[in-house]
Regions:
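Membrane-integral, polyisoprenol-dependent glycosyltransferases
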Residues: 2-306, 313, 326, 331-332
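Short, composition-biased linear "edge" segments at structural boundaries
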Residues: 313-323
Length: 332
C-alpha cells in the first residue's frame, strides 16, 4: 500500500456501496413529518411559542404590537427570540383559512428541521472530502473513491443524527430551540464548505450567524462564529490557499461584528445560566453515558492497550487537523 494519507483507515471500494437515496429520504420523512402533523401544541414551551406567533399574526388596529418586542398577555418574551416568532406569524397570515393555525405556524419549523438534516449531510460530506479524511491509497488500486467514501460517511452522520437527536433535544416543537439548532447546523455547513464553494458558504454563514442571533442566542452566535474563524485561521495544511483562507476568516469576523451591532441596536443581548439549565445538562450527560454503553468503556480499553499506540500516533495528523475539530466546536 502507498500511504499518501494521514488517515490510517483502510477502506475498499466495496465497503462504500451506495445507499439508495429513496431509503435515506424515507428515513428523513418518517422522522420529520409525524412529529409536526396531526397534533396540537403539547408542552408549555410549544404552547407559549404558538401564543406569541398567534398574537403577532392577529394583532391589528388599536391592538397592534411591536414586532421587535413580542408580548403575550402583557408579558415580554424572556428569550428575546424574534425570528422564530416572525416565521410562525407570517406562516399563519399567509396560510389558507381552512388550514388550522397551529399547523400553519409549524410549517416553517418543518423547513428548519429539514434544513438541519440537509446541512448535516452536506457539511459532513464536505469534511469527508478533505485530504486529511481520505483513507489509505492502495498500491494496486481498489481503495474507496473520494466521492463514494465521503457519501458513505455523510450517510452515516445523518443516520446518527436521526438516531440521537431526540435524546438531546425535542426537535419537533415549534420553538426558538429548533431555530437555534437549525442555524447552528447551517453554520457548520458553511464553515465546512468554505474551501469548496465559497460564495454559497459565505451566504450561508451570514444567514446562520444572523439567524442564530435573532433566535434568542446572540452570545452563542458570536462564540460559534469567532470559534469557527479561529479554527480556519489555524489550518496550515494548504499554504497556497492562505490568501483565500484569510479572506474567509475576515468575512466570518465581519459578519459577527455586523450581527453584534444589530443585536445591540435591538437590545437582544442575553447571557444567563439558570440553575434549571445546569440540572438539564447533568441529566443529558447521564443519559448520553447510558445511551453509549458499552461503546465508551470498550473504546477506553481498546485505546489503553500497547498495540493501539502506533495507531493513535498515525492518526494524530488527521485528528488534530483544524477541519476535524470543527464539528466538536459546534456541538452545543
Amino acid at each position: 500500500m502507498s500511504d499518501t494519507s494521514s488517515n490510517p483507515a483502510i477502506v475498499a471500494q466495496g465497503a462504500v456501496r451506495r445507499l439508495p437515496r429513496w431509503v435515506l429520504l424515507s428515513f428523513c420523512l418518517a422522522y420529520v413529518l409525524p412529529g409536526f402533523v396531526g397534533r396540537t401544541p403539547w408542552k408549555a414551551d410549544d404552547m407559549e411559542a404558538f401564543g406569541f406567533m398567534l398574537h403577532l399574526a392577529q394583532a391589528m388596529g388599536p391592538e397592534t404590537i411591536s414586532w421587535l418586542k413580542p408580548s403575550l398577555l402583557g408579558q415580554a418574551d424572556p428569550l428575546a427570540a424574534l425570528l422564530p416568532y416572525w416565521l410562525g406569524a407570517w406562516a399563519i397570515q399567509l396560510s389558507p383559512s381552512a388550514m388550522p393555525m397551529d399547523l400553519a405556524a409549524r410549517l416553517p419549523f418543518i423547513g428548519l428541521l429539514t434544513l438541519t438534516l440537509a446541512a448535516t449531510w452536506y457539511g459532513v460530506y464536505a469534511l469527508a472530502r478533505t485530504p486529511a479524511a481520505q483513507p489509505v491509497t492502495f498500491a494496486f488500486g481498489g481503495e474507496a473513491r473520494p466521492a463514494d467514501y465521503a457519501r458513505a460517511i455523510a450517510d452515516g452522520g445523518l443516520l446518527a443524527l436521526l438516531a440521537c437527536l431526540g435524546l438531546a433535544r425535542l426537535s419537533h416543537e415549534a420553538t426558538p430551540a429548533l431555530a437555534q439548532l437549525s442555524f447552528s447546523t447551517l453554520l457548520f455547513f458553511a464553515l465546512a464548505n468554505l474551501p469548496r464553494k465559497r460564495i454559497g458558504a459565505w451566504v450561508s454563514a451570514a444567514i446562520a450567524i444572523v439567524g442564530l442571533a435573532l433566535s434568542g442566542a446572540p452570545a452563542l452566535a458570536m462564540i460559534l462564529g469567532i470559534g469557527g474563524a479561529f479554527i480556519m485561521a489555524l489550518d496550515t495544511h494548504k499554504p497556497s490557499a492562505l490568501r483565500a483562507r484569510s479572506v474567509d476568516v475576515a468575512w466570518v469576523l465581519l459578519i459577527c461584528l455586523a450581527t453584534a451591532a444589530l443585536v445591540s441596536a435591538l437590545g437582544l443581548w442575553r447571557w444567563r445560566v439558570a440553575y434549571s439549565h445546569v440540572l438539564e445538562i447533568k441529566a443529558i450527560t447521564r443519559l448520553l453515558l447510558w445511551f453509549t454503553w458499552p461503546a465508551w468503556p470498550t473504546r477506553i480499553s481498546a485505546t489503553a492497550t500497547p498495540s493501539s499506540s502506533a495507531l493513535w500516533a498515525s492518526m494524530a495528523p488527521a485528528i488534530t487537523s483544524p477541519m476535524a475539530k470543527m464539528p466538536g466546536t459546534l456541538v452545543r
